[in-house]
């Protein structure tokens, strides 16, 4: 370096020498001049070489006034180790020295002149301050100088960064080249070449920071002026990024000393876990600097934990130590967790401490809860909250993780964060939220007394390895088994000896230690278990394993309402267990010894839970649904594995391997409904052979032992309780508590025919009610009804397809299913089949394999929020008549139609035969049982048997679907009292039903593809040939085929072939589209008042009225969308189920109207005007079927629902009564009067 010349021209020169330009590495001759009256302000100049400077041959290449610099710092990058950087508002200028001594010499000289310049020009840059974090001496000098001038806070460091359009940079429009200026307490973003105000962030507001290659990021909390979020900055290279990271963390750590009491709220606010500034600071060395930033009082303790962690973090300097700063794993969790204030109060800290800095080795009981390797734990774990953070980079000490884990594991944020939950790999389980907050105070969070450790441990669900079986803890909490490694058996705690456990099962209790139970409440369990633990279990399970979350045992007897079984020791019984918590699903509870599942054989989960709208059967190879816990409304559904591991039969699995997400099947039982109406079931509270009344008091779930048990409909007052949950149960049907165990589904005699109850996932919940008309004896064989609304399981004829049970229920008793005898009024017939508890899929009656569910169930109006007009009425009459099934009417029952029972030709015809027989004109070739149509033909009524007015003994005649060619539609007038279209059956594929043309029947009349408004002999009294006058709204000409016409004629004459009886009633008119159109048909509910197409979500609440009013006007709309009549039917467009609007026309009802119905209709008319939505309350009042084959009908009650034949017609069996009432918005003339 050349010394400054003495000549006058160089009197102001303070330093000269050759330095390099960092980018080009070219040497230039630099001259540092002091301020002088002649020369001007202090400045740094450079010339191409010394010669030019001395000879003054040219002006300097560049001159930078020091007063314009707001900071001067030492720097280093990948190319130059010794840089001095000058930052101005507009640019960043750096010079590279060859050695550190040279760098320091220039730096000191620049600082001195810079501070003097600032003294004279206060407004220049805002203060240079500039000590580089690297040179303490300089830093001190720089700070002193800067503060002497007092122009503003000195910037300890300044970096030029490019803020990227990510996070807050984008939302706050902080994008472009900025200066990141660090002071002892703040970080500022100063826009380059702009007068915009700087964005100043308090170091305490920084949650965490980090760098990756040449990117550096800072995450700030809610207290920051910008709000919570991240700033991402790009710098020249990774060396600069690392330097920024280390320097800022150091500053945070330094500040932590001043703000050690930092408020918890802040630390919690640092939910993101990374660097709560205070945290980081204090562990700069060990903990990641970010942690250091947090100044927790607990810091000291957290330090103990963190320091090891920091080492784990990797670079000692790196701020990873602070778990949050690591951010790698814990980014999401709040930094506060780490050692943040969140960590309980200092005294709690002391408690920890006293426990030992051994925190790494917390008391055994605690450690037990923390079976993760210490290395895994992140320091953040120190605070219980931090628990989540522990999963972080694993920098934290084990002990920290452990403690917090057990206590408030579920809460990753500080208690103040209450809303913040983070689930760690370790299984802090969000679900445990309630328990985790036994008290918000940090103390409680941090560490409850060791005695409580067990309970706290149980607070967490142990996410145990798949292999481990779950045992019920005596306290009935969920026990999660960790991978089998290192589990210790806890001798005491009544685990092994619990009366509930059979001998070999008791042995399984040994696993108990490994599992963490979800404690229902913090204080629920006695401390005894915690002490029983064997020595350190902290290493019990490898953290790497995923653990299964499952309830420990089956719920005790139905009466318990999902609470712990009585035999459990009271000490372990949670005082206020939540239903899901109390529920013990484990097989151990099944004392009966029935089929104790072999836990070793538990199926491993394939990892996917099918969310398919259609059938989602459990894969055949999985007994239980593996590790998934069904998301049932009450959380009671447990993985199948738990419920009945061995009972899960592969046959139940859908060939497609989908798990059924049935809305209704998995409804959890009502808590109070536990009392089983069937005494036989209630006898076994714990579930001997699932003696537990899964039906929840409505339908006894009978084991094979109770083949004849019938669902005690009367137990509920004949009324199913509404399902308590508003949520659709998203669990495999088998898994839900309500769904009965597999044995319930299938008789032991035929295990291979064990289809899964497949339900379509519909937006609505479904309620399948017992058909009032069904004989109880027959009902229990008809099919297992899962009424989601009541959460109860109904046992009905097994002949019914499992999936069809839902739809058949909604349709009025499952008559749609392959359950030929279901509607029979001959109880003895049912008696013949006592062993039919197992359900047979409609599509696969002759096939052992499960076919896709044949129907969408329409039955449960549970979701309907509108008051039902008839609700009150039903309740009043429930004592006299079983409640009418409610049908939302929103979704079309879509039935694949395979294996539909043939129509009954006579009282006994095909009564017991589910075989399907299709006349050639109806069904060219027999369809395979499994049903090939991709979209379900909406085949709604084949199973339906109509009883006719003329005589109970008359054979039931059916008209096959008319060929599509016939376009004539009979539009019966509304005035026609009794003729009413039944359900529209849109059979898109070939019909499976066999039609028995035993007697001539009036053909179904079709109003434009609307479901047969069969004008077929609209009323018996009318002349057979008379055609009802078309309704005013009917758009298509009505033609009536004479009643005398043979069924075959009817088939050709009408598009919609519907089964019709001699009385002209069609159980279902059926749109038979040619098989090549496998499109879902769209049924539109015609709204004659305004023709507004009802959105599928709307619920119609129609006053019950005897079916004299029929929405024929609606028929036009149906025809329009449905494809018009005849050939139009070919054009059925696919519509999502949401677009289905159902017009249920019941031709049979058009015939004579009972006088009783008139007043009801009148009332209905008034209601129609007032109700925007009409909820069809379609429950039918059916008297129990008479044992005699005669179908004699007692006079129907005035409130008999729509669709039932009133007057002299014999009461229909439950099948006959349609679940949907015809909606008629126009009053018939007689009613209007």
From Swiss-Prot:
Main location: cytoplasm
Organism: Mus musculus
Modified residues (Phosphothreonine): 441, 448
Protein name: Insulin receptor substrate 1
Extent of motif YXXM motif 2: 546-549
Location of the PH domain: 12-115
CDD domains xrefs: PH_IRS, PTB_IRS
Biased composition (Polar residues): 1043-1052, 1069-1081, 1203-1227
